[in-house]
Amino acid sequence: MRVLPATLLVGAATAAVPPFQQQFQQVLGIPQEEVEQAAPVAPSAPTTPKPLQIFQDQLKSLSDEARKLWDEVSNFFPDSMDHNPVFSLPKKHTRRPDSHWDHIVRGSDVQGVWVTGADGEKQREVDGKLEAYDLRVKKTDPSALGIDPGVKQYTGYLDDNENDKHLFYWFFESRNDPENDPVVLWLNGGPGCSSLTGLFMELGPSSINEKIKPVYNEYSWNSNASVIFLDQPVNVGYSYSGSAVSDTVAAGKDVYALLTLFFKQFPEYAKQDFHIAGESYAGHYIPVFASEILSHKKRNINLQSVLIGNGLTDGYTQYEYYRPMGCGEGGYPAVLDKGTCQSMDNALPRCQSMIKSCYESESSWVCIPASIYCNNALIGPYQRTGQNVYDVRGKCEDESNLCYKGMGYVSEYLNKAEVRQAVGAEVDGYDSCNFDINRNFLFHGDWMKPYHRLVPGLLEQIPVLIYAGDADYICNWLGNKAWTEALEWPGQKEYASAEMEDLVIEQNANTGKKIGQVKSHGNFTFMRIYGGGHMVPMDQPESGLEFFNRWLGGEWF
């Protein structure tokens, strides 16, 4: 089915635009062959679900305004509306027997624990619906992989047996003082990209070189913290499912269950401070996940703060800063010509109008067109230049691997049979990013929903750090600084007026070196990191570890 075409608005992107599938493929850097393989549709299968086929009945009841939005984006992307299946396909997998695992923590057992409260009444030890969940745990031999020998490691799966979901995690104990150092959960974005890319390309104990061998990382974030890397949502990385998660809120329930069962199995870590950190689409995830945790008053998760790096959190504010960043106003030379910059300026009012409608209704019918239109008008022009969307300083060196050859090295390493065996992976293959997941989230309207509205509630209880490498385009520092200043909360005026101060290294051979700028008031802090792209710990490992350690030490809160 196709919706009726509508006249394009003046001010839309003037250059020819790629079809919807190709456009978002470029955002994630996923090769065409992977997209085609991920959605094999036989010509003789006319009943394969398609976005507008699935929505056909509901479209009849749309308001005139919503229908016009769909008409508009259909005119931009007619082919994509006909040919893209909505739902992700299950990954091939072989579940390992229970005897493979050292521990299996049953959610039903945890939920069944009752204690006597201060008032003498019986109450559950921890909140939450956990009976459908299990946690499988295996102590991993570091020597088998050559990754951080001497550091305790655990891998395993969180199982949602009711919904056939299985999330893979990899835990590294702190190199320093694991009995006292904090615990951090790390999340990559996408949506649909594996957190193991963060492990091996950014902040984990090893990177993978061109010989597909692990190389020790002296700037690993487990230098002074224990770190959990989680492949979520399902069907990302080593995780798998027969069903799908298509929005951030649903994914939050899984993360709460994982942490609750993990800390039940390892109470020695539960007593430590706990923090959530992540980047990119984790700007959506983290406000939701932290709010989910804090909503449970009886919990064994000692959440102390959250850190979001180069995140997408408030689209209305952040999309305004694509044109300035691409046109030379972000501290680096312009990538786009004057005509393109003007076209983006012309498109912005319509984009923001659509995002505003999404914020007001939070309806998928309104939020999906906003995502498609705004990404086409404000990200598409930059993509067509061939420049790296994650770093304005250079060209995209490897389109099949998010512009980075290192991403391919990581995928090749994690697809080795001996690696999958060592960590207990149950899938037949590893993918750095799953395009189907990205599309699922978009077609559920998740991309533009106002998750930033949860941040004031977080600020009432815990500190929040927003940091941004200043060479990134896709989630650039201008937009991240702007949304933090626009956020409505009791400390808004004081925070917005706070001056940016130099951020300098304090304790090593480079003491006094300026690595960025920082501003802070109350529980809210923003950092600009010089010379960092979308992945700060990869581009500026020393700077990343410096601010990370100082943040966990409580310097700004």
Swiss-Prot record:
EC class of the enzyme, as a word: hydrolase
Record-linked Pfam families: Carbpep_Y_N, Peptidase_S10
InterPro entries in the cross-refs: AB_hydrolase_fold, Peptidase_S10, Propeptide_carboxypepY, Ser_caboxypep_ser_AS
Subcellular location field: Vacuole
Molecular functions (GO terms): serine-type carboxypeptidase activity
GO biological process: proteolysis
GO cellular component terms attached to this protein's record: fungal-type vacuole
Signal peptide interval: 1-17
Swiss-Prot/TrEMBL keywords: Carboxypeptidase, Disulfide bond, Glycoprotein, Hydrolase, Protease, Signal, Vacuole, Zymogen
Lineage: superkingdom: Eukaryota
Active-site positions on this chain: S280, D472, H534
Glycosylation-annotated residues: N224, N523
Gene3D superfamilies named among the record's database cross-references: 1.10.287.410, alpha/beta hydrolase
Family: Belongs to the peptidase S10 family.
Protein name (record): Carboxypeptidase Y homolog A
Gene from which this protein is expressed: cpyA
